[in-house]
Amino acid sequence: MLSPLALIFIAALAVFVACAGGASLAFLALGLCLVTGLDPANLVPAMPYAGSLLLGLSALALSLLSVLGTGYSGLFLSQLLKAYFRWARNRLFASARPPLPMNPQLGAASRRKVRTIILVALAFMGVSFVAGFAVLAMSAGSPGFWHVWHWFA
């Protein structure tokens, strides 16, 4: 019932959703490490706390954006499967059931809430990242603060 091309596309989209979920968790872990100052695996380089706090807040906002993107991609995958199986069933049995939309149909209130959360998180992420970069550059005395602190040496 599934064509090979459709199966490959659906599998690729499912892998994308899984990877995006993993990225959401990674951004969350990075944000928490930067905000709290805890670094159990010693992966985050040393930096002043003010810059670390601002970059951590930026990473937490990015995690929220990634969670919302993952959720929407999961809804899209689910709706795409429903629409494809409806279409295939109509073709197989010569049925006249109406086709389903390919995109997820969210209610107006849900769309507004998600859009507002995305816009606020995106603005907060941008402002906190630029502020964190500026704080780190000023505390190092150079725009390339990672060179001053020998992060990659």
Kindly label every feature range from the protein language model:
Residues 1-85, 115-143:
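Hydrophobic alpha-helical transmembrane segments of integral membrane proteins
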Residues 145-153:
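Membrane-proximal, acidic/low-complexity disordered segments on the non-cytosolic side
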Residues 79-106:
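Juxtamembrane inter-helical linkers in multi-pass membrane proteins
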Residues 5, 100-114:
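Cytosolic juxtamembrane amphipathic/interface segments immediately preceding
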